[in-house]
Amino acid sequence: MDFPCLWLGLLLPLVAALDFNYHHQEGMEAFLKTVAQNYSSITHLHSIGKSVKGRNLWVLVVGRFPKEHRIGIPEFKYVANMHGDETVGRELLLHLIDYLVTSDGKDPEITNLINSTRIHIMPSMNPDGFEAVKKPDCYYSIGRENYNQYDLNRNFPDAFEYNNVSRQPETVAVMKWLKTETFVLSANLHGGALVASYPFDNGVQATGALYSRSLTPDDDVFQYLAHTYASRNPNMKKGDECKNKMNFPNGVTNGYSWYPLQGGMQDYNYIWAQCFEITLELSCCKYPREEKLPSFWNNNKASLIEYIKQVHLGVKGQVFDQNGNPLPDVIVEVQDRKHICPYRTNKYGEYYLLLLPGSYIINVTVSGHDPHLTKVIIPEKSQNFSALKKDILLPFQGQLDSIPVSNPSCPMIPLYRNLPDHSAATKPSLFLFLVSLLHIFFK
């Protein structure tokens, strides 16, 4: 028997195993680099920028083509530890990485997910804040803010009121990152409550603020996404697990209904980055003891995986001219779901629209031409981890040079301030709301 090989075989699982401890910057970097080295065919590790103190903002990409976008494969992301003292999400994402890479080729569900999705994972958006926590606390610790004492979840441009704060390096890095990828779906992991919160976080009368809520044109989809996560977390779905705190029916809330906030990241993603993002509050205690981490992983594992799958909801495709040339930067939206910042095709002419099962009219608009309408019917179940594929051929030859490369209709100003007080686009009908709830129930 070859004893050195035997000992090496026994040792490798121990080296590769990720423990349930809090990983500071050095330990987190070591783990991420080891994963990137050992699973180089399905991972790509890169930094999107640096914190105020010069710490790298690491992102690990997991996918069959991790280093670049492939047409038809949607981009998904998880971001955690935006508040440095909210720590559970940071560790859950490290364990999610470990689970994904070690399950590839063994678990058919995970293998299919990696084949069909490009998954971006940022364990810590605020590494300076995490390192600043000297005494972990359930309620508040120095470290929530970044090194310059800015709350990063109040630091983004706001669509409802002017947010004249100094944009921080971590925020700027994320904003630039969002421009480099065609993100479709995202979640932002926090702590201090147990709830899945969906946009809007801020609001005006036109979005329902008079009714203590602020709803997007895609409210049915957002409610479905939030319920998808919460319903698979045994404690979150109770809605009242955190004592002496607000109760959340079924573990879900509209952000504005909970409490309004200015400059939040999930609203910025939805309005300016064409990315549906919700906020996940994962623990009643912001910085729980390490021995609690295994139970947090067990309670969130199924939710984390199922939520990634939702990037395949709805319809996707490319827009072509009559000669088969893809058309970038053209408006592609669903009739009666107009976004205040119109959603546009990427440089490959691709579009991704998250939609629940049903019948919809897609409206494609190119400057100088009549709108092109296409009817689609979204089936009850996505096929093989893929949204319905619907390419759209426009009956003219595209003049690519005349199509703007940026979106002039979407300056980073309070776009909603100029809306009329009552906008049908931002108030989903009661029928649509009930249909979405029935869909969630039967799912």
UniProtKB/Swiss-Prot annotation:
Enzyme class: hydrolase
Ranges in coiled-coil conformation: none
This enzyme's EC code(s): 3.4.17.12
Propeptide feature: residues: 424-443
GO biological process, one term: protein processing
Family from the record: Belongs to the peptidase M14 family.
Protein name: Carboxypeptidase M
Species for this entry: Pongo abelii (Sumatran orangutan)
Lineage: Eukaryota, Metazoa, Chordata, Craniata, Vertebrata
